[in-house]
Amino acid sequence: MFNNTVDQSFAIVRPPGHHSHSNLAAGFCYFNNAAVAAKVAQKEQGSRKIVIFDWDVHVGDGTSQIFYGDDTVLYISIHRYDNGKFYPGPKGSEKQVGMGKGKGFNIQYPFNLNPN
């Protein structure tokens, strides 16, 4: 991708690092792999369209926070929510859609296994 030999790419990354915020390690995540890769792709390679698709039992609250006001990265998360009672708490509501220029670029698909 970075040397112009492919037009598109896809990576499956473990561990996700998605609880690590821009200024806070959390959920056993010390750095946010996807956010670092996205920023490097933008800065060093001029990538303009980046999608981070996070499918995990927990919301990627760190990744969401890092790109919350950013319209250059589309962040999509599918995660367990249980009405805000599942880790990491109320973060990851379908109402959290981004802010400013990033509004609409932060998409949350929470599901409830325990609706109470």
Question: What feature does the model see in each segment?
Answer:
Residues 8-116:
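Conserved alpha-helical scaffold segments that buttress catalytic/binding sites
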Residues 1-5:
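Fold-level signal for large, globular catalytic cores of enzyme and receptor domains
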